C-alpha cells in the first residue's frame, strides 16, 4: 500500500469518530439512499430543503451537499441561500450537477449555483463535468480501450473544470478521476453493476460530503468518498450481485456500513498521476 493510500485510509476513522452533521439538499428519487449512506459511513444526515429553515440548518452543519436531480423553483432558492450561508460560515459545499447540459433549467441552475456559491468539491459524470468545463468529451479511438478513453477524457475535463472553478473536481465513471487542477488521482475500484442501480452517483456525492465534513483536505476527502463507493460496489457484487439489482442495492449500503481501515486498505486501488 502506498503512503498516499495509507493517508486516505485513515480518513475512515476520522468520519466515524467525528460523526459530522451533513446537510443534504438533494432530490426525491435518491434522498433516502443518500441519508442511509451518510449514516453508514458514520456521519449524520439532515435533509432539510424548505426555504424557511434550509440556511439555518446549514449554519449548524459540517458540510452542505447540493444535488439538482429533481428541481423546482423553491428548492433552487433554498440551495442558493444555504450555499451562501455555508460560504459565510466556512462550511464546505459539495455540488452534484445532475443532468447539467440536458435542459435549460438545469443549465441555468448550474450556472447560478456556480456564480453565487463557492464550491469546495464538484462531483459528476463525464458528460456533466464536460458541460461545466466547456469541453466536449472525446468518444473516438480504435486502439484504446473504452476505459482508457474515458480515463484520458476524464483527466482533461477534471483538470479543466478544477482550474475554471478553483475547486476539487471528481469525475466518476469506469475510471474515477479526482483533480484540483494540478494534482490528479485515479480510482480503479467499482463494478459495472453500479450503473444498474439508480442514485449511486448521488450516493457517492453524499459520501464525499461526509468526508468533507470531517477533514479539511477536500481533495483527499473526495478521493476517500469515491473510493468507498467503488469498493462497496465490488463487495456488494460478490455478496448479492447474482440475486439481482434489488439485493445488490441493499448490499451496497451494507458494505459501506461495514467499511473500515482494513477493508479499505486491502481493496483500494488509488493511483497518483
From Swiss-Prot:
SUPFAM superfamilies given in the database record: Ribokinase-like
InterPro entries hit by this protein: Hyethyz_kinase (IPR000417), Ribokinase-like (IPR029056)
Pfam families with a match to the protein in the record: HK
Signal peptide residues on this chain, from the entry's feature table: none
Residue numbers binding ATP: 123, 172
Entry similarity comment: Belongs to the Thz kinase family.
Functional summary from the UniProt entry: Catalyzes the phosphorylation of the hydroxyl group of 4-methyl-5-beta-hydroxyethylthiazole (THZ).
Protein name as annotated: Hydroxyethylthiazole kinase
Species this protein is from: Ruminiclostridium cellulolyticum (strain ATCC 35319 / DSM 5812 / JCM 6584 / H10)
Phylogenetic classification of the source organism: Bacteria, Bacillati, Bacillota, Clostridia, Eubacteriales
Amino acid at each position: 500500500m502506498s503512503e498516499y493510500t495509507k493517508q486516505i485510509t485513515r480518513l475512515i476513522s476520522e468520519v466515524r469518530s467525528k460523526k459530522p452533521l451533513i446537510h443534504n439538499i438533494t432530490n426525491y428519487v435518491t434522498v433516502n439512499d443518500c441519508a442511509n449512506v451518510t449514516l453508514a459511513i458514520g456521519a449524520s444526515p439532515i435533509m432539510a430543503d424548505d426555504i424557511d429553515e434550509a440556511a439555518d440548518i446549514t449554519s449548524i452543519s459540517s458540510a452542505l451537499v447540493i444535488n439538482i436531480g429533481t428541481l423546482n423553483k423553491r428548492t433552487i432558492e433554498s440551495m442558493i441561500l444555504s450555499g451562501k450561508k455555508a460560504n459565510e460560515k466556512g462550511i464546505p459545499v459539495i455540488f452534484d450537477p445532475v443532468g447539467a447540459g440536458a435542459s435549460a433549467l438545469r443549465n441555468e441552475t448550474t450556472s447560478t449555483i456556480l456564480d453565487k456559491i463557492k464550491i469546495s468539491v464538484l462531483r459528476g459524470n463525464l458528460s456533466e463535468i464536460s458541460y461545466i468545463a466547456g469541453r466536449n468529451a472525446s468518444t473516438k479511438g480504435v486502439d484504446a480501450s473504452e476505459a482508457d478513453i474515458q480515463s484520458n477524457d476524464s483527466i482533461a475535463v477534471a483538470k479543466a473544470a478544477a482550474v475554471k472553478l478553483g475547486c476539487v473536481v471528481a469525475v466518476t465513471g469506469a475510471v474515477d478521476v479526482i483533480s484540483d487542477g494540478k494534482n490528479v488521482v485515479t480510482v480503479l475500484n467499482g463494478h459495472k453493476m453500479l450503473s444498474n442501480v439508480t442514485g449511486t452517483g448521488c450516493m457517492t456525492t453524499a459520501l464525499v460530503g461526509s468526508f468533507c465534513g470531517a477533514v479539511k483536505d477536500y481533495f483527499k476527502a473526495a478521493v476517500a468518498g469515491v473510493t468507498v463507493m467503488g469498493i462497496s460496489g465490488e463487495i456488494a457484487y460478490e455478496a448479492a450481485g447474482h440475486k439481482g439489482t434489488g439485493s445488490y442495492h441493499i448490499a451496497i449500503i451494507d458494505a459501506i456500513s461495514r467499511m473500515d481501515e482494513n477493508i479499505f486498505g486491502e481493496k483500494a486501488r488509488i493511483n497518483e498521476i
